[in-house]
Each structure stands twice: as structure tokens, then as C-alpha cells.
Amino acid sequence: MKMLQGVRAFQKLKKSCAYSTAAKELKPLPVKETVNMAYDLHLPERSVIGKMPYHSPEPIVFIHGLFGWKRFYRNDCKTLATALQTPVYAVDMRNHGDTEHAMPFDYNTLMDDLVLLLRKLDIKKVNLIGYSMGGKMSMLTALNYPELVSSACIIDNAPINQPHISPFLKVFSKSCQHVENMKIRATDKEWRSKVAVGLKRYIPNPGIRSYLLQNVSGTPPKKYRSPVIDWNDGNVHFVNPVNHLFQCVVKDASAWPVEQVAGKQFLGPVNFIRGTKSEFVNADGEKAIAEYFPYHKIQSINTTHNVLHERPQEYLRSVIDFFKTTRYVLERKRDSERVTMIAKPKPLTSSQNAAEYS
């Protein structure tokens, strides 16, 4: 069984990653169909109902974007948990943060990792917040596992193939590789400044440089040590396996499995937040959103793709208002269904009637 799973995973890897000569020289990452996603659980700081149960109905799962990390959004998740009186799980996707480094790195694999986590946590129904890559991961999960998803908030992404964002992804990856090749010493007191200068060669936006800089460290993460990053060489490194990801990200992060989800719809409420200066949600994206998610709304915020960092208060207000409204509507719908069931009970079969009165 394990051998069969390994073969399937390797077949997915060959399809998803464009190998180059340089890639073959890299120490390979393990190939795994699923990995255990690291997560942090944020509970409301003040609760109107006393201590919040860990398995509250329909918690929120917050999924970061490319080169993100759950710890970046610790304060955001605490704000959401308290404002919505709901547990919030912030997760790290594979090859990010505290989660294992492994291939493949495509949306179907990321979705499988998320579904595995939900089942391990015994979460029957969830509300998703997904940013960038996390947004596509959330949309795919909602379409393929609608029974697991109550609602979703998608931040600056759309369910389409996006070849037009490939240059953006290439710059991201090249900047990270450039910093790795600089071999900046961890003992250098100015290493953060030198990393910032290295990133500036490809990335003029200071907000994006600051975002990437948070992934660079002079010491290995405490919770996970990558098998392909040499933390003993005395240099600073990205905590992500950037040289491996470069082979996949440009192709797979902009992709969308059109054939797999053809004809599928998610009938729950979905809130899309897009940056007005971003190219991720264009006219084709709006059309696809309407096809896959008929009960949606789109809100624009005056930002680039870096929505969460440029306008944190605006996006949080949008998310909180959406989930509060959605909760109210869904609760009224459920109450109405309960009343209907009581008023019009399902007829018993003759055998059930006999058993009832025997």
C-alpha cells in the first residue's frame, strides 16, 4: 500500500515540476502524498459564553500564501477569534513554516493535506480563509469537499489558470535564490540589512521585501529541520526549500485544475477580497468566480496583491462582517428547516408504524 502511494506521489511530482539540470543536482526532497500540517489554535481572549470549547462547531482555518507562515498572522487570527467568538486554526502548508518539506507541491496535494488535518482534528464543517495560494487551495477544497466547508473568504485569487502572473512568481523565486547564493554569514550583525539589499535587486516593493525577509533566519526553526537546508554551514537561509520550490512554483502556483472541477459548484457563501492594484482577479477571474461560486460577493481594497500587509484593518473588517452575516443567515436557515421538519414530519413506513404501536 505504501509503495503504491509512493508511486502515485512520484507520478504527480513528475507532472507538476519542470525539472532542470540544476534541479537534478539538488538533494531531493521526500515525495509524500500527504503530510501533517503544523497549526496554531487561537481561542477568543474574551468569551461571552465562558471558556470556548476546542471543538466548537464550524471553526475557521486560516491559510497563508506563497512564502507565508502562520506566525505572520498571529495577531490577525487572535482578532478574528475574539471578534467572531470562534476558534481559529492558523496552518502552515507543506514547505512552509513549521510543516514538513516534501514534494509534490501542487494544489491537489495541498488540498489533501488540509483534508487530512480536518479529519485528524475531527472537524466536521469549517469556514476557510485563504490568501493567494491559500485562496486557490481553499476554493479547490470547497469544490471537491463541499460537505466539509460551510463558507469561505478568498483573498486576492481566482479559480483560473493565470499565466499572466508567472513573471511575478519568477521574481519572487529568483530573489530568494539570489539571497541564498549571497552566502551571508549568520554571525554578521548586519545580515538582515544585507538580505534586504539582496532582495531589492529584484523586488522594488518594500512591503514584499519585508514579507520575504521574515522567512530568513540564522538558526533552524525549532519545530522542524529541513533535510535539504544546511544549517551547519554558518550562513543565513530561507526556512523554505527555495531552490526546490523554484522548479514548481512558477508553473503550479498559477495553475488551476479546470478539467477536474468542470461542472462543479460550491453552493455556500463565499466572500472574495481583491486588491485594486493586483492582477490576480481579472475579468476572466470574475466570470469563473460566478460559475463556480454562485453565492459570492467581491469586495475591492486599494492595495497590490499584498492585501493582508498593506491594509490589515480593512481586510479584517471585511472578513469579520462577512462571517457574522453568514452565521446569522445560516442559523436562520437551519432554524427554518427545523420548524419545517417539525411541522411536516416524514411519514412512517407501515413497518415503522407497527413497531411504534406494538
Curated annotation (Swiss-Prot):
Purpose of the protein: Alcohol acetyltransferase that catalyzes the synthesis of ethyl acetate from ethanol and acetyl-CoA. Can also function as a thioesterase by hydrolyzing acetyl-CoA in the absence of ethanol, as well as esterase hydrolyzing ethyl acetate.
Name listed for the protein in its UniProt record: Ethanol acetyltransferase 1
Main subcellular location: mitochondrion
SUPFAM superfamilies: alpha/beta-Hydrolases
Gene name in the database record: EAT1
Reactions catalysed: ethanol + acetyl-CoA = ethyl acetate + CoA; acetyl-CoA + H2O = acetate + CoA + H(+); ethyl acetate + H2O = ethanol + acetate + H(+)
A cellular component annotation (GO) from this entry: mitochondrion
Intracellular or extracellular location(s): Mitochondrion
UniProt key word Mitochondrion: yes
Similarity comment: Belongs to the AB hydrolase superfamily.
